[in-house]
Amino acid sequence: MLGSLFRKVFGSRNDRILKTMKKDVERINLLEPEFEALSDAELKEKTAEFRKRLNDGERIEKILPEAFATVREASRRVFGMRHFDVQLIGGMVLNDNRIAEMKTGEGKTLTATLPAYLNALPGKGVHIITVNDYLAKRDAEFNQPLFDFLGLTVAFNIPGMAPEDKKAAYQADITYGTNNEFGFDYLRDNMAFAPQDRVQRELNYALVDEVDSILIDEARTPLIISGPAEDSSEMYRKMNELVPHLVRQEKEDTEEEQGDGDFTIDEKAKQLHLTEHGQEHIEELLKEKGMLDADDSLYSAANISLLHHINAALRAHHLFQKDVDYIIKDDKVVIVDEHTGRTMEGRRWSEGLHQAVEAKEGVPIQNENQTLASITFQNYFRLYNKLAGMTGTADTEAFEFQSIYGLETIVLPTNKPMVRDDRADLIYLTTLEKYEAIAEDIEECRKQKRPVLVGTVSIENSELLSQLLKKKKIPHAVLNAKFHEHEADIIAQAGRPGTVTIATNMAGRGTDIVLGGSWMAEVEKLEEPSNDKIEKIKQDWQKLHDAVIEAGGLHIIGTERHESRRIDNQLRGRAGRQGDPGSSRFYLSLEDPLMRIFASDRIGTMMKRLGMKEGEAIEHPWVTRAIENAQRKVEGRNFDVRKQLLEYDDVANDQRSVVYDQRNELLDEGDISETIVAIRDDVINSVISEYVPPQSLAELWDLKGLEERLRGDFHIELPLQQWLDEEDHFHEEVLRERVLEELVKAYQEKEEMVGPEVLRRFEKSIMLQSLDQHWKEHLAAMDHLRQGIHLRGYAQKNPKQEYKKEAFELFTEMLEALKLDVVTILSKVKVRAQEDVDAVDEQRKAADSAPREFRHEQSGPAAEEPQKNTDNAQGQPVRKGAKVGRNEPCPCGSGKKYKHCHGKL
């Protein structure tokens, strides 16, 4: 109350910032007559003038008013579109490392041209990030004439481009693309074999469209590049056969958990847990199938993979539904994005879940993958020098933007007053009653010739409603993941009088619904366009547009509340654009997931007490408040999930930064011999210390063991025991110096044989190959550590602190293993000529040409648009005979694991 009173007297911080920016808008408006008087050539010259002033040390903020005036005038000449004052304010907000909340239809695409132009002037590049490839290409092509006029280069970055095309795209002043593609390019650059293979340059300025969708909805799980691991398809099939024998325990109270159920389900957390009875039952079933020894336990260390597979199978059957979480298309399980309702071709869930769903549906099971590189969006976007974003709905997540990204949210006023009528929610007892009421509302709107957009949260719901409308003979179009090929056509005409469109989650669709339909879409259909035909289409459209406005504009119907208020607001925001009339209403039932999980019992009891009958609905502030509280709970939980992910990933991020910086230095260096010398000294001293404890008596030395180690790992024969017996002053320091001298001498002989240039290249190849291999294994170790670390809480230990401590120990061990690896390989391998170096490079390239997946895992966890790696695609050699596993004994007979012996190269 006091805060509200304070804001009334002094205004909010948002108001004060807007007030300051309005003064800059006035300055830009005063420049307008001067810039209107410039010729095209003079206006184009402004870009070179601004660049010179920046090179001379002038600050970018000083140039802002003139730069914005230049873009506004150029836009007027090129597009016939003049930036509104509100769009100028939006441009300033975006230049100041902030988030601009701009309502639907306020012209975000045009607003973005202002900060993009200004921040492209220093020549370091601007990345404009969109939610899908279609929008990236559309916006780049739409704005290209404007930037061409101003002398700036524009490109788009989409999956499947050749490396040289990608490199050219990143060299452009302004590059459009998706968040996933920019992130994957960063990871790919840090897996490159040569400096020229990298495509990105310095990450300068990122402008994120639909920033809430990208930095919040998609930030729960990381971007992952993975490669094929071992085949375990048969295991998934066997586990799938066990699931029908397992029974869910209905009661989840701990007191009643000793019942006969095998597992419990936590719908809120989308988790599943085995009961004690379930563990025993599964062990019996596994023993019957011969998958578990008679005296063995499911929880013994050797059987962890069995537990992993049974858990994945249970989750596939009980937590993931066909036509809600995924669809079957061309004999493949295709994930449906819970945020946008789109199918995500090739995207895969991790942790074996996708394979378990494939086994459940009886489609071919794809192999599991191993992580090669990974980063979260939080840590990727924090690499940019400047970051800004825009969306229609950011205010509900303002705290998260501020706390995680350091981005302040500024809510911009609309250019014209908002007149949309947002009606109160209607709550019914059952889903059937709710859908009947929705159908009646649609029929009423059709009588009034009003267009209707119905938003559903899943494909299943959209098809259910579609069947109901078909029975009632109400014509309609369905826009969901199954038919998104026709999406643009459907949306283009969704504003025509009496049109009914059913759409799964509209978030991130990126296309405005224009009242009366899109006359431009009609023009594009003309085989032979002429001015007369275009004018006729425009006149017909104007009549339809006026008729829809007269009828009350677009009506939005929500079939249930989403777990995030922001997604509900995005659906509502489809109506009432640019001051148009419109209305919205949500229809709910006690059977909706959000109501069932969070609010059902209390509200259900209250509704029955009020004497509600079948088909009746209630509108009451208490109920609305209960729903909003439920949404806040979910939003709070999701924020905690993302925050926790970031806290854990920050540990990995520090390690990632060290490894990637070191790797890039290696790539850029022509000669790494100094690094090799330093590593060799460290390794030899460590090895000697294992057999000759520092400052110890000679009686405690294990010289025989050291001789064998030097012979086996470094290929040098030294009579250490003989030296000790024959020399009076053979102290520890003398021993260390002598061993190092002999190792250096042997290495110098190798260098004289092949020449320094060949050896320098070989050193670099081995160093990069070993670093990549150890980093890959380290990522797997970090994954395993992360998955089990929460159990430390039962031992009264802080899991995060334990994770930090053990992650550091793992990282230290990895670096030591890497150094030993490099020195032993360089000591043992005989390099005869340049061909041997080329052979190592070819092996690295062959490993790289193996099929890869590029995944962005969603909360499931699910993964993004895996594109198969098409770069350097080569035929794979055919291996005759059994493949040697990395952990199996080496066939050479050394007694070591294959990965530590001949598997190194």
UniProtKB/Swiss-Prot annotation:
Keywords of the record: ATP-binding, Cell inner membrane, Cell membrane, Cytoplasm, Membrane, Metal-binding, Nucleotide-binding, Protein transport, Translocase, Translocation, Transport, Zinc
UniProt-annotated stretches for the region Disordered: 836-905
Record flagged with keyword Transport: yes
Compartment(s) where it occurs, according to its Swiss-Prot or TrEMBL record: Cell inner membrane; Cytoplasm
Ranges of compositional bias, category Basic residues: 896-905
Positions that bind ATP: Q87, G105, E106, G107, K108, T109, D512
Co-factor requirement: Zn(2+)
Any single Gene Ontology cellular-component annotation: cell envelope Sec protein transport complex
Reaction(s) catalysed by this chain's protein: ATP + H2O + cellular proteinSide 1 = ADP + phosphate + cellular proteinSide 2
Basic and acidic residues bias: start-end ranges: 841-858
Molecular function as annotated in GO: ATP binding; metal ion binding; protein-exporting ATPase activity
Family stated for the protein in its record: Belongs to the SecA family.
Assembly: Monomer and homodimer. Part of the essential Sec protein translocation apparatus which comprises SecA, SecYEG and auxiliary proteins SecDF-YajC and YidC.
Functional summary from the UniProt entry: Part of the Sec protein translocase complex. Interacts with the SecYEG preprotein conducting channel. Has a central role in coupling the hydrolysis of ATP to the transfer of proteins into and across the cell membrane, serving both as a receptor for the preprotein-SecB complex and as an ATP-driven molecular motor driving the stepwise translocation of polypeptide chains across the membrane.
NCBIfam families xrefs: PRK12904.1 (NF009538), secA (TIGR00963)
The protein, known as: Protein translocase subunit SecA
